[in-house]
Amino acid sequence: RREIIRILTDFSITVRPQVPAILQSYEFLAEIDFIRAKAQFAIQTNAIKPSLENKQVLDWRTAIHPLLQLSLAKHNKKVVPLDIELNYKQRILIISGPNAGGKSVCLKTVGLLQYMVQCGMPVPMHERSHIGIFSNIFIDIGDEQSIEDDLSTYSSHLTNMKIMMKSCN
């Protein structure tokens, strides 16, 4: 037991001066691991870095929800890609269709891919796609009914939308 304590003490004395370099190496390794993970993700999902615009625009071609793509690929199924174009002339998009027609998937795809781009992640869409950077991304997910405040699902969504509209650019 004394020998173990002596060995560990000697080891600690030897390593202690190297702690800053070890921590720096650890941070560098974490950064390399992150870059490698992004590259692997890009390969798995055929993701690219789209052309970034200095204006608020979405001009997406064959955009695909990456998590859905990976999930369906396990069953040899493919995701239906979507094209979206929003710009200063065409600022509103109405999405309609039957139940299970892809409306929610479309909205989730837009939100996720926009967020991914703004985090510096590659996204699965055609290389000729263009994407603007937005100062805010707002999301209203789920049912936020409040019995105490007497808010229905619909009025809760309206309250959230009001806050978003006041804060958006």
Q: Predicted regions: what is each one?
A:
Residues 133-169:
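Switch/coupling sub-region of P-loop NTPases
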Residues 1-100, 105-109, 114-136, 159-160:
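Alpha-helical coupling/stalk and coiled-coil linker elements that connect catalytic or binding modules
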